[in-house]
Amino acid sequence: MANNHEQFIAFNDTIKASKSRRDTLKKNRESIRKKIRNYFKNNWPDKIQPQFHWQGSYSMYTLLNPIKDEDGLGAYDLDDGIYFIGSSEDERETVQWYHNQIYEAVKDHTTQGAKDNNPCVTVYFADNHHIDLPAYFMVDGDEHPKMAHKKNPWMDSDPRETTNWFNGK
């Protein structure tokens, strides 16, 4: 049997996102988290405050270098879930309320702006990466959060389960 270990390592090194790219995503994620925390603390101090959990390819250690487009750039992203954990569903706001507040918190974060999509708010960056910010509500003690999706309100969605499964936890 052929030993292709060296070829696999070389291929993996080519496709996986560089440390500098991962560091940029992490720095931008932390900056956005701080902005959202401050926004809720200053504007909605009596409401449930956001908590965060990264998800998607970054959390599964499968973030790849993007395929370049005609401008020589390639889009890549990070997904960062925003969780609102309350003692009952009576504390839950509307799907649109969560989208509006998150959008207001981040809309001027970059010169590229932000967009409110059905499943999340997206913040765009000049180097063609973006950060998706889906919102979730969960009653404390419940097993699964519900996603604030505008087309399918309060759908069951737990990306943490997928990440844990993928990472063998």
Model-derived features: where do they sit?
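N-terminal regions immediately upstream of nucleotidyltransferase
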Residues: 1-76, 84-97, 123
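Intrinsically disordered, low-complexity regions
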Residues: 5-8, 12, 136, 144, ...
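Glycine- and aspartate-rich repeat motifs characteristic of hemolysin/RTX-like Ca2+-binding segments
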Residues: 79
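Generic hydrophobic/packing signal
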Residues: 82-88, 102, 106
